[in-house]
Amino acid sequence: MDSTYIGSYGRLRVYQTEFFSRQQIDQMLSMTDPKDVSAFLYNGPYREDYDSLSAVFKDPDLTEMAINRHMVRNNRLVLFAIPPLAKNAVVAYLSKWDIENIKTVISAKFLGHGIREAEPFLVSFRDIPLGIMSGTLTNEDYRNMINLPNIEAILNYLARFGYGTYMMQFLEDYRKTGDISPMLYSLDRYYYMNLLSALKYYRGDEAPVLNYVRSDIDRQNIVTMLKGKVLKIPFERMSSGIIDGGNIGVNRLREIYSSQDAVSVADALKQYYDLEEPKKKYMETGDLYHFDIAIRNIIARRFLDTMSMLPLSLDSLFYFILRSEIERHNLRTIYLSKVNGMPREITESLLITEMM
């Protein structure tokens, strides 16, 4: 235990009571009108988020942005109470939202969309993306990028932050093929490389967090491989989407990828992740998302309980951050399922339920 965490731990313990319970999630699942879900959120911990955005946005964008904003508010609680030794690790982790926002901007530019179409998808707080809390990209940066003439100009702009320099190695391929996916994959590799480095040189109580991150890399790689197998893409061509640093090494992933099809890949992964249930659902529906959700739940079950039991440590901070992320995922899934008239059983299959 580390006494420098006492202040942050006490503050976060108070705010943990605001996370929705399984019973409250079930209440929202039973609703049929998205307006009822919005009202439920507004009458709970999300009122401030709605009030700050309602003058500019209307549903469904309003509720999506309120959910994003609330998660960022929770992350601010962590950042403002963080012990000095934990700062690099937490900031490195939270830069994932810079990565997601950059992907949104590049994809919007690729599709010919402007800032108005892209803005609802940016994870922001009072018009300030989370990255500004970590000392990187501001909302003005995102507006500048979306107004640039092309993707190459965006990469040049990002060079000052490190992201663009790393992505430049894929620029020539993009010019030849018009395919932006290698660039987007490179952002994930850049993110995890920096995160693992920040955790590797911490102080010794980061093992659950480090194992969580390595398992999340596994998840990304497994999902990429399953997509590649369905599309019949050779491993070498798909390798730009494979991330180093997971529990399953790249050579082992290559061996597994030589399996006949997606079902065989899932079987070959059994020693790492039991994917029998999502495999059955995939065979019934053809939907690969079952694997992603199943692995997310497996990882949450393996590590979040342990993090919650290590109160004065880096793990306690990450437990709160990850609970906030899971709630964001679940609330967005429930709300958008109501907007799109999705059956409850499908909605439930998309939820991360292990820590509710």
From Swiss-Prot:
Gene3D superfamilies cross-referenced by the UniProt entry: ATP synthase (C/AC39) subunit, domain 3 (1.10.132.50), V-type ATP synthase subunit C domain (1.20.1690.10)
Annotated keywords: ATP synthesis, Cell membrane, Hydrogen ion transport, Ion transport, Membrane, Transport
The record's subcellular location field reads: Cell membrane
Any one GO biological process: proton motive force-driven plasma membrane ATP synthesis
What is the residue range of the signal peptide feature?
Answer: none
Q: Which Pfam family, just one, is annotated for this protein?
A: vATP-synt_AC39
Superkingdom to which the source organism belongs: Archaea
Q: Can the keyword Cell division be found in this entry's annotation? A: no
According to the UniProt entry, its GO molecular function terms are:
ATP binding; proton-transporting ATP synthase activity, rotational mechanism; proton-transporting ATPase activity, rotational mechanism
Q: Which NCBIfam families does the entry link to?
A: PRK01198.1-2
The record describes its quaternary structure and partners as: Has multiple subunits with at least A(3), B(3), C, D, E, F, H, I and proteolipid K(x).
> What protein name does the entry list?
A-type ATP synthase subunit C
Q: Which organism is it from?
A: Thermoplasma acidophilum (strain ATCC 25905 / DSM 1728 / JCM 9062 / NBRC 15155 / AMRC-C165)
